[in-house]
Amino acid sequence: MLLHIIARGKIARSPEEELVTRYEKRLTWPVKLTELPETGGRIPDPQTPFKTVLLDERGKDLSSHRLARQLERWRDDGMRETRFVLGAADGHAQEERAEADLLLAFGSATWPHLLARAMLMEQLYRATSILAGHPYHRAG
């Protein structure tokens, strides 16, 4: 299953970009990064069937294990792509939230956009490592 991160704005050269690249290289699942302008821009057509996850401060705060199990269910149900969409500074429109399969939050705090992107990539690596039985995640 393709893990497709769709984000507004360019990450450019930054410490966050280094983290994103580090975890992208470690991932064994296929991953694609799409950067869109802050406004406008067209989200590419998905591989179908697919699921959409919006990163949103009103979303569910899933543990790494719960995220792993959700990805596993979608993969086993035949999803070809899961899209993780990070909105612009003002977040997502109500229509986008209503159409999403999952709203995901990294706790109740608000995170800088670039840091949220790096955190997402790390969590995807962690979740896929859990599913593979890799010792990266140390539950305690």
Curated annotation (Swiss-Prot):
Its EC number is 2.1.1.177. InterPro entries: Alpha/beta_knot_MTases, RlmH-like, tRNA_m1G_MTases_N. Keywords: Cytoplasm, Methyltransferase, rRNA processing, S-adenosyl-L-methionine, Transferase. SUPFAM superfamilies: alpha/beta knot. It catalyses: pseudouridine(1915) in 23S rRNA + S-adenosyl-L-methionine = N(3)-methylpseudouridine(1915) in 23S rRNA + S-adenosyl-L-homocysteine + H(+). S-adenosyl-L-methionine binds at L55, G87. Its main location: cytoplasm. It is found in: Cytoplasm. One of its GO terms (cellular component) is cytoplasm. The keyword Methyltransferase applies. One of its GO terms (molecular function) is rRNA (pseudouridine-N3-)-methyltransferase activity. It holds the Pfam family SPOUT_MTase. It is an enzyme of class 2 (transferase). CDD domains: RlmH-like. It comes from the Bacteria. PANTHER family: METHYLTRANSFERASE, RIBOSOMAL RNA LARGE SUBUNIT METHYLTRANSFERASE H. Specifically methylates the pseudouridine at position 1915 (m3Psi1915) in 23S rRNA. Homodimer. Belongs to the RNA methyltransferase RlmH family. This is Ribosomal RNA large subunit methyltransferase H. It comes from Erythrobacter litoralis (strain HTCC2594). The gene is rlmH.
